[in-house]
Structure formats: C-alpha cells, structure tokens
Design a protein with these regions (language model features):
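Non-heme Fe(II)/2-oxoglutarate
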Residues: 1-89, 98, 103-107
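Generic detector of short, locally flexible boundary/turn motifs and exposed helical patches
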Residues: 58-62, 83-91, 136-140, 158-165
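Terminal (often C-terminal
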Residues: 94-95
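Catalytic core of non-heme Fe(II) oxygenases with the double-stranded beta-helix
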Residues: 98-173, 183, 189-191, 195, ...
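Short leucine-rich amphipathic alpha-helical surface patches
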Residues: 173-176, 199
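Short, charged beta-turn/beta-strand-edge "cap" motif at the junction between a beta-strand
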Residues: 177-181
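Double-stranded beta-helix
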Residues: 196-213
Length: 213
C-alpha cells in the first residue's frame, strides 16, 4: 500500500474488552472461595451450564474486590467509545463461580437481568487445568475447554466466532446479549475455575448513592 494512502478500519457489532488481572487479585478470590465455599448458595438452577458446582459468591467479595470489578466495567464503557458513558453507570449485580471438571460444559447462551435490559457480563479465569485432553480430530484447531463468543453476523466478510483458551488472570467483559459457550474437556481431574459477574448499565439518575461507589 502506498504511503500516500491513508487507511482507517471501522467495525460494527459487539465489543469485547480483555483485561489481565494481577495474581494478587486472583489469589485473593481463590483463597476466600476455598475457605468459605460452605457458606455459598448453589446457583446452578439459575444458570445454563451443565456444571455441578456453580456458586453465588456476592457475599464473599469485599468492597475492595467489588470496587476493582466496578472499575473494570467503567473501563469497558470508556474503551468502547459508547455515548452511554455520559448518561449511564455500571451497577454490580450477581457474581458466581463455576468449578468445571472433565465432561462438563456450558451450552451456548446469553445473560440477562431482572433490573435492566442493558448490561455487561464477564468471565475471569481463576484456575485452569494443565491439559484439556486429547482432541478427537484436528488438533491444530483445538476446542477442548475453550471459551467461544458467537456474533450475530454470519456472512463470509464478518468475524462471527472467537474461540479462546485463556490463561489465569484473563478477564473478558462483553454485553449481556453476546452469545457464548464453553466446550467440554477431558484427560484430567483438575478444575477449570471461572468467576462471572453481571453488571447492569442504568441511567445515572436512577443510581442510588450507595450503588455509586
């Protein structure tokens, strides 16, 4: 391409923001969950996953942890360039931890909230197994244990799917309505642990002072 030609690329559709969270933050969440899991509520009936251990953890997260998540959701709004950042604010909803083992999986689904039609969901990787097992076929394009986002555009000039094998500390934020799935894995008894946090995006005039922290 000639240096005289200026190129810009514009994309439409959903925005996914990835952050890399520090090990101290990951360790803090893992430690409090391991110590106090007995106090958590089974959340599996509220979720799409075919996963035995899915626990609501709102009460395990202290104000510092919640504040960090709040800042991450604000960063999403800032990075996305959406005009909503001027008129709306993120308000934390429910958080839960999935301990996923071999043979379990999460069917394609999206998130919602009883409080808002507009919102962000997320997934933070807390633990990953050393292996996801042998691929049945085509090992050069692995799927075992992978997280996949599925966009709304399916034509040949669009990127319609994004399949990822994240590492511990990776934190993905995306709209409630973005369809996503997690493939099963095998060959290990180690856990694949993630935390998901829903966050409503509501008009600033509706946010009470205590929710504005």
């Amino acid at each position: 391409m000639s240096e005289d030609v200026k190129v810009q690329v514009h994309t439409l559709g959903e925005i996914i923001v990835k952050l890399e969270m520090p090990k101290t933050f990951i360790d803090e969440i893992n430690n409090v969950f391991d110590e106090k899991e007995i106090t958590t509520v089974d959340w599996s009936t509220q979720l799409a996953g075919k996963i035995k251990k899915e626990k609501l953890v709102n009460h395990l997260l202290d104000d510092n942890i919640k504040g960090t998540f709040q800042m991450c959701f604000k960063e999403y709004l800032k990075r996305s360039g959406l005009s909503l950042i001027q008129t709306h604010q993120p308000v934390l909803d429910n958080a839960w931890i999935n301990d996923m083992f071999a043979g379990e999986y999460n069917p394609a689904h999206f998130h919602s909230s009883k409080n808002s039609f507009v919102g962000l969901s997320s997934v933070l990787f807390l633990k990953t197994p050393d292996t996801y097992g042998e691929e049945i076929i085509n090992p050069r394009t692995p799927s075992n244990g992978h997280l996949e986002f599925i966009g709304g555009q399916q034509h040949s000039l669009a990127i319609s799917q994004l399949r990822l094998s994240p590492k511990v500390g990776d934190f993905f934020i995306f709209p409630y309505t973005l369809v996503h799935t997690v493939y099963p894995f095998s060959g290990t008894d180690q856990v694949r642990r993630t935390l998901s946090y829903n966050c409503d995006i509501v008009p600033k005039v509706m946010v009470k002072p205590k929710e504005n922290k």
